[in-house]
Amino acid sequence: MKEINSNILSDITVHMKYAKYIPELQRRETWEELVDRNMAMHIKKYPELEVEIRKAYSYVFTKQILPSMRSLQFAGKPIEISPNRLYNCSYLPVDSLDAFNEIMFLLLSGCGVGYSVQQHHIKKLPFIMQPFKFRTRRFVIGDSIEGWSDAVKVLIRSYLGEKRASRIVFDYTDIRPKGARLVTSGGKAPGPQPLKECLIKVEGILEAKDDGSRLTSLEVHDIICHIADAVLAGGIRRAALISLFTATDDDMISCKSGNWWETNPQRGRSNNSAVLMRHKITKEFFMDLWKRVELSGAGETGIYLNNDKDWGTNPCCEIALRPFQFCTLCEVNVSNVKDQDDLNARVKAAAFIGTLQAGYTDFHYLREIWKETTEKDALIGVSMTGIGSAAVLQMDMKAAANIVTKENARVAKLIGINSSARCTTVKPAGTTSLVLGTSSGIHAWHNDYYVRRMRVGKNEAIYDYLLAYHNDLIEDEFFRPHDTAVISIPQKAPDGSILRTESPFDTLERVKRVAEEWIQPGHRRGSNTHNVSATISLKENEWKKAGDWMWENREYYNGLSVLPYDGGTYTQAPFEDIDEAKYNKMSKVLSNVDLTKVIEAEDNTDLSGELACAGGSCEIV
C-alpha cells in the first residue's frame, strides 16, 4: 500500500516539475523516458563509457539515486547549448559590473546563485556617473537569455561606466509575446513585461544616486532581487538567491524588518546571511547576533561561518564555493538501504554520474574565470536523503564517503578532469524527496502517518485527468476554488523512523554526526568543507540553549536555517498529521496513476514549478 502512495506522489511530482513535453505524442515524458534522455546525453559525450553509464543509470531508473535535477530537466539540446544549465549551485562576489548581468544569465538558466555584497567586495564597484539627460541610445533587447542579460548589462554600464554615457531607451519589440512556445527549454514565453518592470525598478535605484557616489550593499542587493523578480515572472524557476554580507552591516541585517513585504517585496527573493569569520569571531558578537535572529521572529538574518573572506555558498548552503564557481549535485536514496554493500553500491553509482556531470564546462557568455575555477576543483556534491528513516545511521558512512572519493578519482582520470576538491554533502531535498518517496535530506519524517498536499491549476491537463480517473485525490483549493485544486496523498513513514516530534537538539546532533562521518571524509581540499543543509525549528524556551550549541559546535556547520517553531494548523496545509485508521481509509481507494493519459495539445510545462530550495521552505509545494 505504501508503495502505491509514494509512487503516485513521485509520478505527479515528476510530471509537473521535470518531464518534457513530447509534441508528436501530445503528452509529457514518463520517468523512464526522462531518465533515458538524461542517460543518452552522457553516452553522447562519453561514448567510451556507455556500458558503465548504463549500469550506473540502472540505479536511477529504480529511484535508488538521482542525478542533478537540473540535468534531468534540461538534458539534451538545452545543456549542449548552455552547459551551465546542468549545475545546481553557483557563487560570485559582486565586485565588478559583470556580476549583475551574469546573475540574470545564471538565474534564467535555472541555477541557484549565492552572491556577496560584503563591503570589501562592493567597494570595488565604480562610482556612479549619471548618463546625459538629453542624449539617448536605443537598445533592442534580444529574445533570448543572453538578450535579457545584456539589457541589464547596458543599463548598469550607462550609470557606472568609465565615462558619461547616453541614456538607454529599451526596445522590446523583438521579445516574443506572452504564451509563445519556448523551443529549447520548453514551456511558455513570459513576454516583455517582467523584464520591463525589472529594468524600470533598477533604473529607479540608479537614478536616485548622486554623481560620484557609490552603490550601498543594500542597493546592490535590491538590484539583484529585482533581477530575480523578472526571472520568477519569466517562468524559469522560483529564483533562488542567498546574499552574504558583512556582519556589521546594519542595513542588510534589518532589511527584512518592519513592513518590508509591502514596501520592498523583491527582498523576499533572497535569503540573507551575515558572514562570520571562524578565526576572528567572539562569543559575545555571535550571541548578540543570535539574539537579533531570535527577536526577528522569522529566523532573519542567517549566519554563515567562513574560513576565507572571499568564499561563499549556494542558496541552500550545502556547497562550499570559491568565487565564480559551480557545483553539480547527485542524490542517494538512503531511506531503504538494506545493508552496507547496498549503500556502497548506491554512493558509487552516484559518484560516477556526478563526476560525468562535472565534465560539462564549455560555458559561454560568462567570464573565462568561471570555467577556470569550476575546472580547477571539479566539484561534485553527492548528497543523501531519507536519513530520517534511520537505516543509514546504523551503517559506516565514513566507508561510504571514501568510496565516493575513490570512484570520483577513477572516473575523473578516465574523462580527463581534475578529481573533486569536495565530494560529499547533504542538501535539503525538498523536491527530490517527493520523487524518491523519502523524508527530506537530514530532516525527520513529518509523522508516522500524514497527508502530503500539492497544488495544481484547474487549467492544467493533469487536473482534468485526475478529476476523471482519480477524483478521490483531488479537491477544490479552499481559498481559490475558482482556479486551483489540491491533490492530497496519504503517506506512511517506515517503521523505526525519526519523526518531527524529536527535540531540535537531536536534529543538531545528527547534523554534527553526519558532518563528521560523511562530509569531512569526502573533503580533499579547500578553505571550507561542504555542509549539511538543515532547517531547525525552535520553541521560545529553546533559543538560548540552541545558541550555545551553535557556538560550541561551529566547526561542524557553515550555515543552518533556524526558524521559530510554528505549531499552527492551516486549512489544506502541505503536511497534515493523520492516524492509522484515516491513512488506511484514504489508501483503500487509491490506484496507480497513468499519466500517459494526460493529453496536452500544446506545451504547457511550467519550469517555475521546480522549487529552488532555500532552507526548509522548499518543503512547501
Predicted features along the sequence, with ranges:
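Extended catalytic cores of very large enzyme megasubunits
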Residues: M1-V621
